[in-house]
């Protein structure tokens, strides 16, 4: 018997991994990457708007991001949003475009970023464990309500644990790869 609880747990764990993956993409590794700006929100006519919807982002050089606003009047708003973000980058505004120079990472900064990757990984693993906990509760309820037998419950609990272990392993692997990328620069 294939249980809907298992399928739902797999979907939710995969969503947690996808969120972690998108968060990892915004972690700076010393090279220009447009996804660094994915979480930057610009106050535009009183409405928080994602920067990526307000400007074209190009990479003219390996360590330079160039932001060309669709509306030139939003240039200062974009500059303020970048300064207010947690990117730690200083925008250079020439009146037409904003340039972000991605500095070389120092050894100390690389270690800080590697720790941040670890924190993000731990948050993702907590999300996976929460999904596991919900699935286990649902299985216990199904057994209590007579929908599944006690043996089926045990078998399905093992399956949930297997999916949890696989998800956790995948998160650890992604974190290790990102740490290597950061440390090696």
Swiss-Prot record:
Record has Protein biosynthesis as a keyword: yes
Protein's cellular compartments: Cytoplasm
Domain of life of the organism encoding this protein: Bacteria
Keyword Transmembrane helix listed: no
Pfam families referenced in this protein's UniProt entry, alphabetically: RRF
Keywords annotated in UniProt: Cytoplasm, Protein biosynthesis
Gene Ontology BP term (one): translational termination
Ranges where the record places region Disordered: 138-185
Gene Ontology molecular-function annotations: ribosomal large subunit binding
InterPro entries reported in the protein's UniProt record: Ribosome_recyc_fac, Ribosome_recyc_fac_dom, RRF_sf
One Gene Ontology cellular component: cytoplasm
Function: Responsible for the release of ribosomes from messenger RNA at the termination of protein biosynthesis. May increase the efficiency of translation by recycling ribosomes from one round of translation to another.
UniProt xrefs under NCBIfam families: frr (TIGR00496)
Family designation: Belongs to the RRF family.
Protein name in UniProt: Ribosome-recycling factor
Source organism of the structure: Lactobacillus delbrueckii subsp. bulgaricus (strain ATCC BAA-365 / Lb-18)
Gene: frr
């Amino acid at each position: 018997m294939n249980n809907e609880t298992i399928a739902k747990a797999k979907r939710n764990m995969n969503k947690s991994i996808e969120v972690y993956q998108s968060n990892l993409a915004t972690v700076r590794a010393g090279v220009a990457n447009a996804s660094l700006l994915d979480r930057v929100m610009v106050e535009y006519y009183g409405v928080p708007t994602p920067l990526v919807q307000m400007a074209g982002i190009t990479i003219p050089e390996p360590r330079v991001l160039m932001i060309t606003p669709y509306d030139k009047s939003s240039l200062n708003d974009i500059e303020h949003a970048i300064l207010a973000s947690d990117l730690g980058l200083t925008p250079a505004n020439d009146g037409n475009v904003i340039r972000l120079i991605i500095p070389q990472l120092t050894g100390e900064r690389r270690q800080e970023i590697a720790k941040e990757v670890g924190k993000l990984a731990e948050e993702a693993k907590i999300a996976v464990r929460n999904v596991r906990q919900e699935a286990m509760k649902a299985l216990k309820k199904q057994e209590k309500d007579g929908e599944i037998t006690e043996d089926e419950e045990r078998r399905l609990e093992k399956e949930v644990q297997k999916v949890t272990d696989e998800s956790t392993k995948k998160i650890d692997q992604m974190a290790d790869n990102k740490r290597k990328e950061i440390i090696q620069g």
